[in-house]
Amino acid sequence: MSSSALKKWEIVIRFASSIPDLSLEISDAQTTTIHSLFKIVRNRIPECRDKQLKMVFQGRLLSPGFTVERAVRGNWQRDENDDPNIVQKAFIHCIVGPTLTEEELASQDQAQSGLNSNSESPDDLQNAQTGETLRGFDRLREAGFTETEVNNLRSQFHRLRGTNLDSLTEDAIREAEDDWIDNGGQNSSADELDMSYETLLAGVLIGFFGGAIACYFLWERTMFSLRMQLSILVGIICNFAYGLLHSYRW
């Protein structure tokens, strides 16, 4: 018997509203889909019976075609010597949307059944369900975030990371945001790494050769990112140290 079969799966559906948490024991997470969880929620919770439902795990919108195992992948890793009877638990947030008609609910079920019968991959399922694929922090709009909240989060994220938005393509920026949402920023792309080195080098050169003029950039926070400002400060310190050593030499 495989280790996957020995695991006990518990999914806790947590709602943004005052609806109590719904705990579900999943016997086969490899075949149970998010769409199946929609049906369970509608059957067990009267308030959700005719509502539009969306589920989010760690800031990532889950496609109805995803299996539970794929949706929470990485959350079940454990040592092989652990007790197989220990229940693995994950929390999935459920967003309750507007009321749907019976025709709309039936249409969703029919569309999902058709996708399952065609045996499409999870990525194809997601593309078929969402017409336009949202990337980066724009995905959070599906989770109920307003456009202002998304823009504020994006601005703060790139400011703290010192991202030079002018030197990156739109795809590279969205890729960095996707990486942070999906992996907690553990995996950085090569383009972003190269950009960070270029930013540090440019800042040090500005600080070293700019002299006192470079100090202006330390107070003008809207002109450069935090990472660039720190590298400029390093350049100024290097300039000061070089001048000090040069004066002692003479």
Swiss-Prot record:
The chain crosses the membrane at residues 199-219, 228-248. It is a multi-pass membrane protein. Residues 107-130 have a biased composition (Polar residues). InterPro entries: Dsc3, Dsc3_C, Dsc3_ub-like_dom. Glycans are attached at N187. It holds the Pfam family Dsc3_N. GO terms for biological process: protein ubiquitination; SREBP signaling pathway. Residues 105-130 are annotated as: Disordered. Pathway: Protein modification; protein ubiquitination. It is found in: Endoplasmic reticulum membrane; Golgi apparatus membrane. Keywords: Endoplasmic reticulum, Glycoprotein, Golgi apparatus, Membrane, Transmembrane, Transmembrane helix, Ubl conjugation pathway. One of its GO terms (cellular component) is endoplasmic reticulum. Component of the DSC E3 ubiquitin ligase complex which is required for the sre1 transcriptional activator proteolytic cleavage to release the soluble transcription factor from the membrane in low oxygen or sterol conditions. The complex also plays an important role in the multivesicular body (MVB) pathway and functions in a post-endoplasmic reticulum pathway for protein degradation. Belongs to the dsc3 family. Component of the DSC E3 ubiquitin ligase complex composed of dsc1, dsc2, dsc3 and dsc4. This is DSC E3 ubiquitin ligase complex subunit 3. It comes from Schizosaccharomyces pombe (strain 972 / ATCC 24843) (Fission yeast). The gene is dsc3.
